Amino acid sequence: FSAYGYTEPQESDIVYINDEMFKITGTEEEGLHICRYSDEEVNYDAFTTVYADTQVYTKASYERKNDILILEIGSNGGWENYRQLISQYDAMIQNSGCDYYIIVGDTDDPGTSIADTTQGIRNEDGTYIGVGDTAWEATLREAYGDHFINMRTYLIENGLTDVGLRPTVGDYKGFRRGRISKQLRYDWTHFNSYGYYSKGAIYAKGVELGYWE
C-alpha cells in the first residue's frame, strides 16, 4: 500500500542509535550485522557492536517522532492480557515524547480476533454486543478516555453511509451481533477500499481533540 505522496525508501533496514544512522545487514540464518550508514555511502566492513539495552530506533520512528501518533494494536500485537496491551501503548506514547495521540480500537468482529479469543457476540447477560463496548474496547476507553475511538462501532454505524452503500438484511443481523458489514471487508480481518476509506474518519477524532482544523 502506498499513500498519496509516499515514495518507497531507497534503503531498507535503516535504524538510528544515539542520533547516528546505521544499516542492518545479513540474515537470521547467516547472522545479522550492523554498520554505519549515510545517504552518500555505506561501509559494510565497519561492523558495530550493539550492547544490551541499547535503544535502537527504526528510521520511520526516529524521523516521525514528533508527529501525531495514531496507534492500533490488533491481532498481531503479541500481547497476552489487557495489562500488557496497555503497557505496550504506554511505552510507544512515552517513547515518542508526544502528547498528541489517537488510540484506534480493533476492527475484528467480536469472537474472531486471534489476539483476544475470550470475546464473543454476547454480553454476560446474554444480550448481543451490538454497538456496545467489548471488554477489550472498554479497557482502552478507560485507559485513554477521549483519545480512544471505537472504530468497530463507528464502522457499524457510519461505514456504509460514508461510502454510499446501503445495508442489507444480513448487515442488520450482523450489526446486532456487533459485526461490521461484509460490504466493507476484503476478508475476515482486512478491509476493502470502502472499509479503509471509511476508516479514514479517524481524522475527525483528531479534529475533536484539537489536532487538526
Specify the residue positions occupied by each region the protein language model found.
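Alpha-helical cap/lid subdomain in secreted, periplasmic
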Residues: 5-213
